[in-house]
Amino acid sequence: MNIRKSRSSTTALLTSLALLAALPLPGSAAASAGDGPVWVGRFDGGLAPWQEVRLNAKLKPNNFALRHWDGVAALEVQSAGSMSLLGRPVTVDMARTPVLCWRWRIDAPLKSADLTQRSGDDYAARLYVSLAIPDADKSLGLRTQLRIARSIWGPSVPDAAVNYVWDNRQPVGTERPNAYTDRTMMVVLRSGAADAGGWVQERRNVGSDVARLFGASATPVQLAITADTDNTGETARAGFADLHWVPEQAACEKR
């Protein structure tokens, strides 16, 4: 599955959101939220309903593989001057299970990436949460922008997105708009090489992040994971495992 970033000036406003446009909308394959945990990525029994999506056939895709990595059932992503995503639809109740847990790892951070520049919008590891926002909470300008984007990319272009990234230079805790569009907010969870080379556990209150960045009515509809090197031409290897939603007061599941 491969998704590519267009650099066309006519679509730059929502370029990073359009990377997820080819994913199916939430349906029977999506995870249903309960009191938790709600598993969305075990990677020990096949990929479904995760899918590979490619928007630009000219852009080199990443390589994705299921593997056991240091005893962990995981998805491995290898990226070499390439960009593609593995994504899936989700339906999750933010009032019940707002916290997303996962493990990830990288071999090393990128060297020349710079999230403040379009030319440097690459990451050793990247997790997308795409959002839907009720029409009543969208400005006329935003509705117009989304209508144009969907006329180009299709009806599943999301309203907004939060990206959790393993960066190479910005400090942990950095939050700023994506270099292509302010409808995607970048959140730096790891930075540099300090935690590289092994599995790192993350526990993030996505509900809180989404409400703060895009309003309380925004809800997750898609997840995607990747390593991203198409702009810098570098190489990266990342792993993802054990993605699941839990209640705010609950611990992440151990496997």
Say what each PLM segment does.
Residues 64-85:
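Short carbohydrate-recognition loop motifs
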Residues 122, 126, 132-180:
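Extracellular/luminal beta-rich ligand-recognition
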Residues 2-16:
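Bacterial N-terminal signal peptides that target proteins for export
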Residues 31-57, 140-147, 255:
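Extracellular carbohydrate-recognition regions
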Residues 89-100, 193-196, 216:
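Extracellular/lumenal carbohydrate-interaction signature centered on repeated Trp-anchored short motifs
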Residues 127, 182-192, 196-234:
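Extracellular beta-strand ligand-recognition surfaces/modules
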